[in-house]
Swiss-Prot record:
This is Protein-export protein SecB. One of the proteins required for the normal export of preproteins out of the cell cytoplasm. It is a molecular chaperone that binds to a subset of precursor proteins, maintaining them in a translocation-competent state. It also specifically binds to its receptor SecA. One of its GO terms (biological process) is protein tetramerization. InterPro entries: SecB, SecB-like_sf. The gene is secB.
């Protein structure tokens, strides 16, 4: 019966939960010669979905603008279902806010780069993210909803 008390951490499934691409000013903006400005925002969400099962999602919003006109806007949410059992409660925040997002994020990066490339733009490669630092920053900001962290 000792196996029932052993910690369990397994990925059940990784999936693309949401993806949208908008090019509201095409085709005219495609003829612009000016260099666009890039804004990237990331967020992490964790939700229980059953006894010992959790969905962890990493979201990205990538927007490029020339002056005040949007060149393109990509919103993506990559998620995974994790089975997590028999883990001390004081470790769950770190697992949900650091370990799980580190597993999900590479899938998100690939999907975002792919959709931007397929839309006819040079790929935007999302950089590596320090989820530990992001988690610690959120913890320091207080007990509340996890605010998206902006990276550039």
């Amino acid at each position: 019966m000792a196996d029932q008390d052993n910690p369990v951490f397994q990925i059940q499934r990784v999936y693309l939960k949401d993806l949208s691409l908008e090019q509201p000013n095409s085709p005219a903006i495609l003829l612009e010669q000016e260099q666009p400005n890039l804004d990237i925002q990331l967020g992490v969400e964790a939700t229980p979905v059953g006894e010992g099962f959790f969905e962890v999602a990493v979201t990205a919003t990538v927007q490029t603008k020339i002056k005040d006109k949007t060149m393109f806007l990509v919103e993506a949410k990559q998620a995974a279902i994790f089975e997590i059992r028999n883990v001390p409660e004081d470790q769950m925040g770190q697992i949900m806010g650091v370990v799980c997002p580190q597993i999900v994020y590479p899938y998100l990066r690939g999907n975002v780069a792919d959709v931007i490339n397929r839309a006819g733009f040079p790929p935007v490669h999302l950089g590596e993210i320090n989820f530990q630092g992001m988690y610690e920053q959120q913890q320091a900001q207080a007990a509340g909803a996890a605010a998206p962290v902006t990276t550039q």
